[in-house]
Swiss-Prot record:
Protein name, UniProt field: Threonine--tRNA ligase
Any one annotated GO CC term: cytosol
Gene, per the UniProt record: thrS
Cofactor(s) essential for the protein: Zn(2+)
Keyword field: Aminoacyl-tRNA synthetase, ATP-binding, Cytoplasm, Ligase, Metal-binding, Nucleotide-binding, Protein biosynthesis, RNA-binding, tRNA-binding, Zinc
Gene3D superfamilies: 3.10.20.30, 3.30.54.20, Anticodon-binding domain (3.40.50.800), Bira Bifunctional Protein, Domain 2 (3.30.930.10), Threonyl-trna Synthetase, Chain A, domain 2 (3.30.980.10)
Upper taxonomic lineage: Bacteria, Pseudomonadati, Pseudomonadota, Gammaproteobacteria, Candidatus Palibaumannia
Length: 642
């Protein structure tokens, strides 16, 4: 007789094992209709799983975060069902739940076209309207293998052979005649899967290896209600308008061409933004007492073998050779910084030594993964490495956390997610070292009152790391900052310092990046601001324009004042209507347009208009410059008011 305690404190006693769905029905018909799964003693279970003993139960609906993930998992399997209806010859590989959606990779000779995706979506709706129950069965590993072998699902057989213990039970989910394996949970009935949209297809490879079979990936999104789906699709349209590749072209910021895939040609205005970011970060480096250095782009392969990068990271490293020597084009800056540290004998009094570099790095990313500024092969890291004693680690991490948050808040990012990535299976260093490194990071985050999640097994091969992920105005996640402890690399490269007892000790090395890749961060900013950069970042901050030729000399005089004040300004003396000029510079997202007519000359002032169409009225030039300099110097996000 299991006694079930519901979240609200209600206790229910049953004479026999009971499922969450049956309990929901007992509570109310509405609860039964909305029950998609449950937390049983804080563990996610299917709504149809039987509860055998006294338990705590929290019923999950499609409105909950966990419920949405379950709904999307079920929609993904509904997609599989529809694929097999339309193309029985398709071979199913793996499907995954991703942020706000799902995807399934399939092996199908027929290349999917837009009309095929429309047909798939229609088939999914037809199947969902049948309101069939989704059936869960546990079978032995051997039984599962026989089922998939009989169905010709060679990839499922491979997954069973390579990834699943032969002594475990395998959960199979039946969507009518379509069967797939999954950890679950799934919705109890297909009626939960009505509010979805198939979005796009792409090419991928079995096990992410381009030497394996080419697959087609189908992406979709799914939501609990039709209104949620419509709102999400509407936000996607807005995101599409903000595509950094499109705006980058409109504003003439940069380009990428075939002859240099994943490498950026910065144009004048784009390079201004790049340099402003560098200047901002440099100001932080000075405040936090960093030394700036520059290390070579190419270093002999033997050094990368010594560091462990070659054995752990070789597929991402570009190489070149000269005079019978093989060189690696650096994918990261850390080995070079250790070489600089090693050029002198350092005392404990010299520590912490904070070494920063805007390092130009190259990584051999697959061509199919390249995406504008967001995924490139050549990028600039705002990289730093701190050499310190074990006793100094927590203070240094504290300082880095403070600096990161100051930088992110300057750009207007308030929602910051933090993950602590722990030791991967393939790593260097012993477990004792990893235990200490992970504990130091966790303790510092806790002491700072920062909520974080563990990302188990996602650390670098040489140390655990804290990852800072920014949520933009569309709640898209951008992982930018990292703070990473490394007790191994300094030892491998024979770095040491002399302690107060005149002994040689290996320093702790902290890897730190704030923006990460400057190229990628500019892409993020373009989309976050829709090209409306804060004035301090805007390539052109002010445009001066005349109404007629009578004001040309006055405009030129005012331009000289702006130049003297180090404000990035341009003049527009073209013989065009003033409305035309205003529209053109508004489209260029110039923060301030200064209009000069006869009235302005008479009063010795200028009329100021913002790119948002706001007329600020007339200002004396010196007064405007003073306000503008304050806005720029304080890196304000807001503009001058009347």
């Amino acid at each position: 007789m299991p006694v079930i305690t519901i979240t609200n404190g209600l206790q229910l006693t049953f004479q026999k094992p009971v499922s969450s769905l049956e309990i929901a029905k007992y509570i109310s018909s509405n609860c039964e209709q909305n029950c998609i799964a449950s937390y049983l003693n804080n563990r996610l279970v299917d709504a149809v799983d039987l509860i055998m003993q006294d338990s705590k139960l929290d019923i999950i609906t499609a409105e909950d975060k966990a419920g949405l993930d379950i709904l999307r998992c079920s929609c993904n399997h509904l997609l599989g069902h529809a694929i097999k209806q339309l193309w029985p010859e398709a071979k199913m590989t793996i499907g995954k739940i991703i942020d706000k959606g799902f995807y399934y990779d399939i092996d199908l000779e027929h290349k999917l076209q837009p009309e095929d995706i429309d047909a798939l979506e229609k088939c999914m709706h037809t199947l969902a309207n049948k309101n069939y129950n989704i059936v869960k069965k546990y079978v032995s590993w051997q039984q599962a293998r026989e089922i998939f072998q009989a169905n010709g699902e060679i990839y499922k057989v491979a997954i069973l052979d390579d990834n699943i213990n032969q002594h475990t039970l395998v959960a199979l989910y039946y969507y009518e005649e379509y069967v797939d394996m999954c950890r679950g949970p799934h919705a109890p009935n297909i009626r939960f899967c009505h509010h979805f949209k198939l979005q796009k297809t792409s090419i991928t490879y079995w096990r992410n290896n381009d030497k394996n079979k080419k697959l087609q990936r189908i992406y979709g999104t799914a939501w609990g209600t039709d209104m949620q789906l419509k709102c999400y699709l509407q936000s996607l349209q807005e995101v599409k308008k903000r595509d950094h590749r499109k705006i980058g072209q409109q504003l003439d910021l940069y380009h990428i061409q075939e002859e240099a895939p994943g490498m950026v040609f910065w144009h004048v205005d784009g390079w201004i933004i790049f340099r402003e970011l560098e200047t901002f970060i440099r100001s932080k480096l000075q405040t936090y007492k960093y030394q700036e250095v520059k290390s070579p782009v190419m270093i002999d392969r033997t050094l990368w073998e010594q560091t462990g990068h070659w054995s752990n990271y070789a597929e991402h490293i570009f190489t070149t050779s000269s005079e019978n020597r093989e060189y690696c084009i650096k994918p990261m800056n850390c080995p070079g910084h250790v070489q600089i540290f090693n050029q002198q004998i350092n005392s404990y009094r010299d520590l912490p030594l904070r070494m920063a570099e805007f390092g130009s790095c190259y990584r051999n990313e697959p061509s199919g993964s390249l995406h504008g500024l967001m995924r490139v092969r050549n990028f600039t890291q705002d990289d730093a490495h701190i050499f310190c004693t074990e006793e100094q680690v927590c203070d240094e991490i504290n300082n880095n956390i403070k600096m990161l948050y100051e930088v992110y808040h300057t750009f207007g990012f308030k929602k910051i997610l933090v993950n602590l990535s722990t030791r991967p299976a393939h790593r260097i260093g012993n477990d004792k070292i990893w235990d200490k490194a992970e504990q130091d990071l966790a303790t510092t985050l806790t002491n700072n009152g920062i909520l974080f999640k563990y990302n188990v097994g996602a650390g670098a091969f040489y140390g655990p790391k804290i990852e800072f992920t920014l949520l933009d105005s569309f709640d898209r996640a951008w992982q930018c900052g990292t703070i990473q402890l490394d007790f191994s690399l300094p030892s491998r490269l024979k770095a040491f310092y002399i302690n107060k007892n005149n002994q040689r000790l290996v320093p702790v090395m902290i890897h730190r990046a704030i923006l990460g890749s400057l190229e990628r961060f500019i892409g993020i900013l373009i989309e976050e601001y829709a090209g409306f950069f804060p004035t301090w970042l805007a390539p052109t901050q002010v445009v001066l324009m005349n109404i007629s030729d009578n004001q040309s000399n006055y405009v030129i005089q005012l331009m000289q004042k702006l130049s003297t004040a180090n404000i990035r300004a341009k003049i527009d003396l073209r013989n065009e209507k003033i409305g035309f000029k205003i529209r053109e510079h508004t489209l260029r997202r110039v923060p301030y347009m200064l209009i000069c007519g006869d009235q302005e000359i008479k009063m010795g002032k200028v009329t100021i208009r913002t790119r948002y169409g706001k007329n600020l009225g007339m200002f004396e030039m010196n007064n405007f410059i003073e306000k503008l300099q304050h806005e720029i110097n304080h890196r304000n996000l807001s503009q001058i008011e009347k």
